[in-house]
Amino acid sequence: LRVRFGSSAAAGTPQSSLWLGGMTGWWDACLAAAFAAGLAATCGGPALADEQQPLAQACGGDEFARGTVRRILDGRTFVLDDGREVRLAAIEVPTLGGPQDPAAVPKAAAAALDALAGGDEVVLRRAEAGSDRYGRLLAYAYIVRDGDQFLLQQELIGDGFARVGARIASTCSGDLLSREKAARAAKLGLWADPYYGVLNAEIPSDVLARRGQFALVEGKVASVRESGATIYVNFGRRRSGDITVTVLKRNERSFAAAGLDLKALAGRRIRVRGWIEQRGEDRAWIEAERPEQIEIGD
């Protein structure tokens, strides 16, 4: 099976193709069915760039480096020709898939990044954190072709190979969240696998089962309370067995500046993204450090 990549002629980006051989389980079945129906994009084949509108504002800070992508390590990490490792900021790409085929989505994401950027020049713009604990550069990476620049994070999110992460530049958060929503609605890429779907806060056991993982959780807020230096946004009314989103009170001002009144969330439906933690025996927690992690439900 081959999934076509490319862009509009106006952008001057040559088309390339990606071999997705060797995959098993739901991914193979989905691709086979989709190709038979002429709907390859349903399973997340990267969409043509002419279907992606340019970002209203550039993601990231100043340009700090350029280089050629020499090697892909995973769906969000690559090595430049000078040996530096770069980790794409603002996105999360699964390192393990669902129980049916754990390797499918991570393998597809890495192959997608290779097809988009392998051997090409990239421009790196600063992320809020310059590097991670492993010394890898954290950056917004723009691929350069024929003088035009395309944000890799934008392409991976829009084609369903990545989710918007918990730390994202506010200048382009709305755009990337919108692209994720469209990919989710169209069941592109990882969104074709129910394992990666938005978790229901009314089923706490499903959320708790993802402890240690990045996930999206949606539900109706039962209450908002304060204690000490923390604001607690509770999906349930019990002290145990439910889900809580925590926000440090020192961060409340940044949420308010983004138009998010935390204390007015009771009774509202929200979607929160972040890392699932376990507190006590049966309570799931998500720490929200930034307003972009919380969306008001449709």
Please state what every model-predicted region is:
Residues 30-42:
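Bacterial N-terminal signal peptides
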Residues 3, 9-11, 29:
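Acidic, Ala/Val/Gly-enriched low-complexity intrinsically disordered segments
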Residues 17-33:
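Bacterial N-terminal signal peptides that target proteins for export
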